[in-house]
């Protein structure tokens, strides 16, 4: 990052940390509502793409039903934005309380001594899944596509790595898996 980008990054990081200290109900209701309003009504962020995808995915549904799904999508997207803001300030204890995994012991036992891949969709609160490190001794790699905006890319990288998850750019995945594939260091890719 150049000097100006470093200033932008620090402002973004500390702003998110400060906002993240607000009660979660305020964040999700007020800030989430504001983000939803901006994305859905003002900016109309990818609205035509969403409508086209819904029409292709649900041709049997009426226009009104698809619009309801569209509104719910933007509601969900705004919550993901709030989750991202929370990543700058949330405590390890709180993030481990927020995301609960079923059958972790069985998965860990089955994968004992092996590297493994967890394929996850962008459904639910995917930004908070970085807390899987709370449940494993494995080296957790989170594969991501770098953002074009270097300030936001650095923000996401720092936020995702706060609890020990190692963000890995998509193009560097194989190199990092090989590097982490030493005895006793089995990577888990999420």
What spans do the regions from the language model cover?
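Membrane-proximal helical "anchor" segments flanking the first transmembrane region
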Residues: 1-117, 124-125
